[in-house]
Amino acid sequence: MTQLINPSKFTNTVGLLRSFFLDKGFLEVHTQNRLSILAACEDPFNVAIYNYAGQVWPLPQTGQMWLEHELLSQPDSKGFFCVSTSYRQEPNAIPGRHDIIFPMFEFEMPGSVDDLKAMEYELCEYLGFGNITEKTYAEWQQHFGLSADTEMEAEHELAMEKEFGQTLITNFPELTSPFWNMALSLIHI
């Protein structure tokens, strides 16, 4: 079930995130009032709906598509970010891992995947996280003794955090159902 969030921690965390991106010239986008079926693109099997102004809409799961819309509308921008509420009607929510309603901070920026990774590392350093252990999905599978066609589960993610602290997973294979807009690597096809 969804837990109450400590207002002091929320204020401090969102303040740090806002400061980081505003200092880089990003603009904040209010996405929560935009009605769209695209706001429910994370997992179609846990979409909740509501009736508003005589039409049925999905409760938003992400502001990603609106951030991408702004980025495409203003390609010379530094980037965009939003703070929104995500609604995920998880049928098998894992306590401590899944909240069915939670605040989410997202950003989009122009550039390559290497630019994105550099930004993520810089953000983690700014927020005070320690060293980050980075491995490809295949390397993490090998670490846990999983075959290449076996998807990692929540238990593996928890073990990563316990053993390594902060981690980064790259190069997600097709078996993990990556987002439809992610680049496809033809290396292993």
Regions found by a protein language model. Give the residues of each.
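Class II aminoacyl-tRNA synthetase-like tRNA-binding/catalytic domains
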Residues: M1-P110
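Generic amphipathic alpha-helical segments used as scaffolds and interaction surfaces in large
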Residues: L4-S8, N12, W57, E108-D114, ...
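Short beta-strand segments
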Residues: P60, V113, T170
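Metal-assisted phosphate- and nucleotidyl-transfer catalytic regions
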Residues: K117-L186
